[in-house]
Amino acid sequence: MITLKVNGRTHTLDLDPATPLLYALSDDLELRGPKFGCGLGQCGACTVIVKGQAIRSCITPVKSVEGAEITTLEGLGTIEKPHPLQKAFIEDQAAQCGFCVNGVIMTAKAFLDKNPKPSEQEIQQAMSGVLCRCFTNVRMLRAIQRAGQEMAR
Amino acid sequence: MKPVLNCDARSALHRAGFSRRTFLKTSGALIVTFNAGWKNAEAQFGGGPSAGSPPANQVDSWLAIAADGSVTAYSGKEELGQGIATVQQQLVAEELSLPFDRVKLIYCDTALTPDQAYTSGSQSHPANFNRNNLAQACATAREALFKLASERLGIPADQLSAANGVITAKSNASKKVSYGELLGGKKFTLTVNTAAKRKPASEWTVLGKPIPRPDLAPLVTGRFEFVHNVRLPGMLHGKVVRPPAVGATVMSVDESSVKDLPGVVKVVVKKNFVGVVAQKPWQALQAANKLKVTWSPGAGLPSHADFYEHVRKQPARDNLMVDSKDVEQKLGEATTVLKATYLHPYQMHGSMGSSCAVADVQGDRATIYSPTQGVWYQKTTAAMVLGIKPDNVHVIFRRGSGCYGLNGADTVTYDAALLSQAVGKPVRVQLSRKDEMAWENYGNAFVMDERAGLDAQGNIIAWDHESWSPTLGNRPGPRTPGNVITGYLAGFEPDAFAPRPAAEPRGYNNGSNGIPSYFAGAVGGTPRGTGTVKSERALAHIVASPFWTGPLRSPARLQNTFAHEGFLDELAAHVKADPVAYRLRHLRDPRLIAVVKEVAKAANWETRPSPRPGNRKTGTAIGRGMACVLYEGDNGYSALVAEVEVDQDTGKVSAKRFVVCNDVGPVSNPNGLRNQIEGGALQGLSRALGEEVTWDDQKVTSIDWRTYHTLPLGFDVPKIEAVLLDRPEEEATGAGETSITLVAAALGNAIFDATGARLRQIPFTPERVKAALAARA
């Protein structure tokens, strides 16, 4: 049995300890935020935040995050009460297919929490390990910058 | 079969008081040929809408108004991430004078929506926004509602106006009646009237406005249901085991190798299709990795290094697009003849999320949740794969990861269907990254020869274009599941390839942009092209491919445009002409001329020949280049200026600024259009700078994001400025593939402007740039 704390709730799951966290989140808990993009930690689609760090849940065994507070995209905000990042993405219409958005927002969240007033270059650097194959780069980077200003207020 | 409606559809129909099936069955509709958006599909696959499709000529196939006034529209064009659902909703709201959020749009479900072939090829706007289909059904409905209101209120229709679903007398606001009251929950029972008057763009209040996409909030908060998130009761998980080499076949499968693994339900083998079903996805993956399959050796692959030469030597199926028959003679008379060869690699869709589908096959019936671009074609081909009747297959579109054309969507749907059939339970399959990338239907590689003759004044007097491109498989269409890997492994053949000489062109068709913009395009005497060069030939050779191929955003159009627009630039440079002025000298289409002029103005284009005077041969050099196109010969005008910085020591190319001008007829949603222009431009940049499928002597080696090189989200992103020419009086055209078509050409031209080195092979890797710099005169 593995105990996972996700978005403030505790779940006890019967899992092989080697199971990647992503599988527990999207299949056992049926969360829709974290996604399987590559299974290799290369694209970011599966990103969640653990202890303030954006981690790739597709290559993180559940055992290694047992008991730690895990935040997913669902945990940031809701449609009615979106997080400033989510709000900025809606306002800037910063998505196309939307599959990458989880990785983009979660990576940006962990980054902005540590770097409240980043420059454009710092944001680009922080987002250089995340992919968006629809190439919504312009809007997403702009939304991150605006959300950063909002969050720093 | 019991149709499975999604919640929204079910509640809408419940409110309306009938089932959709009953609704259409009892409509008494006369089924006649009607254009449901078949332009590309007919050319490619022949035939018309599938049996069982709601008839496109009936208003009820597109629109239902319930007694409570709620409006549901049905479309065969689906949301793939480009905002087409939003603009279709805008269209319906506009034509029926409703607020945007009063319209519910349902798309691509074979139990509910009309067959409009594939959602592809920038055809959704042409199909549903001009004088037929969804737009015209709404216009017909509006006229019918006004007629009913006129009778009910005793006031002539021209003295009535509509707003918020209520028709009111212009002279007396108390005299009014709602749509719901007028129809009383009944059907329209009306044939779509192609002469029904559309609302003029000057009166638009919803269409043409930057309405935000309703799917953004659920997407960014993790509430949106992708096909990856579909969960059915009792659902199991499948993984496929693909061959280790191209052409390898199954010799034996040792099922005992996984029988002790936890959760394994079944090993499934059908000819060369191999898969595993387990209780949980992680268990399925373990089992697929451990399953012992003995494969025959692969067929062997042509050398990657010499591939373009190999392609030229293959037997070909030829397509002659235009031939004035005097090209050789005119080239002989020319003062100067220039030649160049342009090369484009196979590239992949490389969807962000690997493809996924969920199938529930019970006996001779199947319900399938698929990200396919063609639910009706998936219905007939999945039926073939399963060996059941198409009537018994219900396909429901659910959004996948952005596809940009034929990614793994269709193939993974067959995977899920086959595995579900084997276990009699719902099965979800998501491909591994490698299975997605090694076996998808790649965008075509191209070899393109350009030859042109100039007179003493530097005018182009003759131009010859000849291309070679390999092909294998394609979209499955209505009857060819073997066009993608799973169908083939399961025993179906792809479209046969037969070499044949070219026939004389029968009409002007520039669907692949094989004909340069500067050709007169005189097929059968009348010039239909966009240019002035009368001595012209464009010939395409299609050859057999060792890899699966299929449409990738701007298929063939991007490759051909890269060659044509790069070569035009070479001609301009040769005669020391300004590239914009030289284009304008050889163009005659006023709308294409307009986008070229507008983009030059917006970019503050400096009129002078390339290369840029004063640039040094070392260090960083800046330059600008342009390209233009009438996409598919009739589907959107676009011109693009690229400004680049080239590090001549490292060979690194950085795009600094893109300025794009688009004319797509009436603009449905300016913000959505800008999103497409921006995304297309950057995807084009990624494809121009880094993307290339690679292989060894047995197998594809570009199988993940370390071996297939895409630009990440964070890089030195160029500024993108879009100029939209709104032409409400013209027909609506596509817009998703215009900017991407121009990037490689404009970028290559800008690199030449900066450095004097001409790049004729995609991708422009630092090594290739350095080689071109070293080869400068």
List each language-model region with its residue ranges.
Chain A
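Signature of N-terminal electron-transfer/Fe-S-associated modules in redox systems
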Residues: 1-153
